[in-house]
Amino acid sequence: MSDDFSVFWRNNERASALFYDLLARAKRGAYDDDFLAQLAAYREAEPTSERADIFAAKYLLHHGDAENAAVCAERAYRKRPVNYEVWLLLADLYARLNRPIDALIMQGYAYGLYGAPQFSFHLDEDQLREGLGRLSIALGMGKGAPLAKVRAVIREQGLQFSTDLFIGEPLPLTMPPHYSRFWAASYTDYYLSDQGIMLDHNRHTDAFSTYGYRAASFQLQQAEEVRGPSEIQIPAETTAIVPIAGTSHLQKLTITNAGASHPLYLGKWAFSLFRLEGSAHITPADDRPYAIGTPIPLGHSPARRKLVLNILVDGLSWGVIRACFAECMPNTARFFARGTIFDQHFSVSEFTYPSLPTIETGRYPAHTQVFNENDSHELPLDIKTLSESMADLGYYTAAPLGAADCIYSGAMRGYRTLNAAPWTLPSADMAERTIRQIEAFNETDQFLYLHTADVHPWNPKGFKFYPATETHLPLTQRVFEVDENVTSVHLAQLPVYQDHFWRSLSCVDRHLGYLFSYIEAHFDERDILVSLYSDHGNSVFTMPVKGSVDVIAENATHAVWMMRGAGVPEGHIVSELTSTADLYPTLGTLCTFPVADDIDGNLPAVFGGKERDAVYSMSMFPGQTYKLAVRTHDHALRLETQEKVDEDGTVDFADARVGIYPRTHELDENYVVDSAELRAFFCPRARDFVREIANNGEFWPSMRAARPEWFGGQP
């Protein structure tokens, strides 16, 4: 690459030549000493490439060393977990190593995304439930838990698939040590069994899988499923709250606690809460299973706050509301006037699925590898999530209302209770549920996560706009043709979307005001830490560029972040650049949990850290060009690749279009700024940011051939 940065990216031609030479040798099965020599040269040329590990695994497998081949393949999987070649390799290796469930998971990933190869497996009777459950998740999308795009079952005809969900059972996910799996139940405030009975009736219908799921609400509780008598272990002289759910209507148990026995009547797939003094014994009336949630011990600690509250307002753009914040969100503005507001805060991603794991881990999507919503791989357990870290401190971690987007990926695995909605996240429910949650568990320290999508734009076909929007807009602005396949980030700048946004924003603020008033009336300032933030901005206030929506424009990525409570400076509007990755280390500092050295998040200077010199927003969506914005206070480098992003998140940066602009005129070619000083600042940072997803023009033929609409059918 040239020293003057006049060319942004040059591929390593020697490494590319070595890759294609190794590819040709592998195709011939020529795994000899010359192959090893070429592999050594390739690894020297590309020391961090997962492709070298794939070739090493193929070599070892050819020579009968499946165990060490798996070590290499798993190293490749750690870096590139959404990769067809890696999946095929691991499926073969795990089968050879007598790891049939792991092999089946890899087959599921491959078939779910590419439709091949056909399944080949053998599971023992005691492996069927786990294996088929894992396969069902692997075949489906990464969002929507506990829904299953397809559910794998064994019938007389063999392996069959049906529309379904996980309900009244544990989610087959990998949990941290000493954590129980999420047991999937319905969420209900009234009659215990009604929702469960309706779900049981509708779960396999097209009507539910296509429409009904949008109104469904679930409660995922870390719990153990048991049959027969059981013991609930609680230390002596300790009071704890224990969630218990049944699997049938009015399921009867007898519970013995503190020397007395009591009858319990449970609902079908619904949790009820019980206060216990010390350990308890349960005697069921029959052998039907039931679920016992992880006990929640009561008690406060001076090392913790009584309430740490995170509120995600999905799609709220600070760039849109900053000039009128006090007028359009008066309750929120009043509450956070006693805290700190970040004025230059940007999301890393343009939509929720990759953005939420960034917030929950402090890592960019290149490091979480959660970016492809058609894949459901899990975060490695050594990536500690925000909820896990808070649970380690002794907080009761719960989400009174949360999206179902990132449960399968593991980004939400530290929440003991997670009320998940696949689609509908109204702020009215959010506020009321939160107050009920705080009241119910006011004898313990709580870390709560909330998520509302009221202001998020949706494709208008079949969507119900805010009532006042429908009654006040004339037909010329209210009714129009639209492609039902247009995603929210590509919605145009139209009056109906904008009017819906402003009216919904007032609704959100009204309900937040209700919640904030409750908090101020019941907590001292030293006992709270409240954060309000968004995961991305909003496309419907973004000017089109050459007829297309700029999905990482300022208004689409200029996000919201404000904090109030113990340790937060009061009355500050901070101009330093911040990222959605920065919430994680900030809470680590304020709440005193350890933060790994290798995260991407930065502790803001206002909390004792160091100011960022740039902030990054990008779009890493398979089948679309990769886009990047590197912003300072005054300028922005904008990049777009010529080629589309592959399913594994990699892309070729050769010939990428790059320009530097004033922040106020991004992508306006009349304002391009081309100076050696700016190139020397921006280009090294942009290169470092994209380096881990740059494929150097090296492609696996099987992946290219599977996406002719993206790559023209050329390997």
Feature map (PLM): residue ranges:
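TPR/TPR-like (Sel1-like) alpha-helical repeat modules
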Residues: P100-P117
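Catalytic domains that recognize anionic headgroups
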Residues: S2-A24, I54-F55, G112-A116, F121-P715
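Short coil turns that delineate tetratricopeptide repeat
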Residues: E46-T48, P81, Y114-G115
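Canonical positions in the second alpha-helix
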Residues: A41-Y42, R75-A76, A110
